């Protein structure tokens, strides 16, 4: 709470949240948020590896690659895509978007690592990157929850009301190879898109604390 309050004060978005005394040194605060930004960068990098690995092996010149992100399970969240729009948001709202994306992708990544690792489409490279992403997503999620604990319930409520639920498992294990490949491509493409948003929101939180936005 102390950290999120300091950040909120810096952008003048929540004056009533500002305590009179901050217990955490600015240097420590800066280190924590820079580490969060590094985590989000790593998530993008591993997601990019997963996407390109599958794309090069299975998806070249395939019709299902067209408009694949139009049916991502997170589309109804309407998360901001433009940096300019995200920069106009206060830090509490940014933290909500971060948690919404992290929560929404936990199940598909978990199933990819635990239940789908024997699928031929899940190469060692993809599996290794997926495992790294699971670890880093859980670490980033824990950090955001600690600093912005007040948004956890509103985020869960929003996800519930928007009916954000990934239901692609049946297609991923389909006996029809075209159906299976289309589902894997959509999974990796949607994750790639959302990881870039996640990275942008986290980077904005970090650059605000270092005054480098």
Curated annotation (Swiss-Prot):
Compartments where located: Secreted
Domain of life assignment: Eukaryota
Gene Ontology biological process terms, A to Z: cell surface receptor signaling pathway; female pregnancy; mammary gland development; positive regulation of biosynthetic process; positive regulation of lactation; positive regulation of receptor signaling pathway via JAK-STAT; response to nutrient levels
One Gene Ontology cellular component: extracellular space
Coiled-coil spans in chain: none
InterPro entries per UniProt: 4_helix_cytokine-like_core, Somatotropin/Prolactin, Somatotropin_CS
Glycoprotein among keywords: yes
Alphabetized GO MF terms: hormone activity; prolactin receptor binding
Disulfide bonds: 72-190, 207-213
Keyword Cytoplasm (UniProt): no
PROSITE patterns: SOMATOTROPIN_1, SOMATOTROPIN_2
Keywords per UniProt: Disulfide bond, Glycoprotein, Hormone, Secreted, Signal
Glycosylated position list: 45, 67
Main location: secreted
Signal peptide: 1-13
Family assignment from sequence similarity: Belongs to the somatotropin/prolactin family.
Function noted in UniProt: Placental prolactin-related proteins may play a specific role during gestation.
UniProt-recorded name of the protein: Placental prolactin-related protein 3
């Amino acid at each position: 709470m102390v950290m999120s309050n300091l950040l909120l004060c810096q952008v003048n978005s929540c004056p009533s949240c500002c305590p009179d005394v901050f217990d955490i040194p600015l240097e420590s605060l800066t280190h924590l948020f820079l580490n969060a930004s590094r985590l989000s960068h790593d998530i993008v990098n591993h997601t990019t590896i997963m996407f390109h690995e599958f794309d090069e092996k299975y998806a070249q010149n395939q019709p299902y690659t067209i408009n694949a992100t139009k049916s991502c399970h997170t589309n109804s969240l309407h998360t901001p895509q433009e940096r300019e729009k995200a920069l106009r948001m206060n830090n509490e709202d940014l933290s909500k978007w971060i948690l919404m994306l992290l929560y929404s992708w936990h199940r598909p990544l978990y199933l990819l690592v635990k239940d789908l690792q024997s699928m031929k489409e899940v190469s060692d490279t993809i599996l290794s990157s997926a495992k790294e992403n699971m670890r880093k997503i859980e670490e980033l999620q824990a950090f955001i929850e600690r600093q912005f604990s007040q948004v956890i319930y509103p985020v869960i409520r929003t996800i519930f009301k928007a009916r954000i639920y990934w239901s692609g498992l049946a297609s991923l294990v389909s006996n029809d190879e075209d159906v299976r490949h289309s589902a894997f491509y959509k999974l990796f493409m949607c994750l790639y898109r959302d990881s870039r948003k996640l990275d942008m929101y986290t980077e904005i939180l970090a650059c605000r604390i270092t005054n480098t936005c």
